[in-house]
Amino acid sequence: MGKFEGKIALVTGGTSGIGLATAQKFVNEGAYVYITGRRQNELDKAVNQIGKNVTGVQGDISKLEDLDKLYDIIKQEKGKLDILFANAGIGNFLPLGEITEEQVDRTFDINVKGTIFTVQKALSLFPDKVGSIIVTGSTAGSIGNPAFSVYGASKAALRALVRNWILDLKGTEIRVNVVSPGGILTPAYDELFGDALEEVLENSRNTVPAGKVGTPEEVANAVSFLASDESSYLTGVELFVDGGLAQV
């Protein structure tokens, strides 16, 4: 029997990379999983790849009506939620002198506002106020990166929110933690760096203490730990999955 047998999980941003790997991990461990994504074709491909015990729901977490639709579906079909992996997010490079209002609004709409209401609207679905919430942060929220300040600020905001949420949730058994990846080989990572990817990978081999970038599966393992009873006395922590990058 898997450690998530009988559990219902939601993974936002579950169509590729870390989200997809985590959804697959949850299913492999016995959970029924809902995944979200903004593009139906990518959602369909992810559902087919996972293969069983999964439902895809199209939506944009920055739109509250999409979140309401999502949670209505989960409530009607399963009646509860045990695990929430609030993973959906975006990021792009723009140096200070080129930051636009559109970039700031879009990044904070999805990464911050979207995550706030993803978590808030899930609370009523946790049975007997018991469950685990994991929020995707980033090493960019803790260390500086050229041209990445807006994204970094949005992830630092999530870290601050979680510190406060654990106080708001005192008296329940709902735990909230942050998983903060460093460089992880995902489709989004490829898209972010484009032609500079090989240079980035070589730089990582020289600067990351582990000597490499990570894989989505390595992050999924950390999320699985935080979602499980194995981490029952952990709440409010930030677990870095970064090969030691943020520690030096």
Swiss-Prot record:
Substrate binds at S138. NADP(+) binds at T12, G13, G14, T15, S16, G17, I18, G19. One of its GO terms (molecular function) is oxidoreductase activity, acting on NAD(P)H, oxygen as acceptor. Gene3D superfamilies: NAD(P)-binding Rossmann-like Domain. Transmembrane segments: none annotated. The active site is at Y151. The keyword Zinc does not apply. Its EC number is 1.-.-.-. InterPro entries: NAD(P)-bd_dom_sf, SDR_fam. Keywords: Oxidoreductase. The keyword Signal does not apply. This is Uncharacterized oxidoreductase YkvO. It comes from Bacillus subtilis (strain 168).
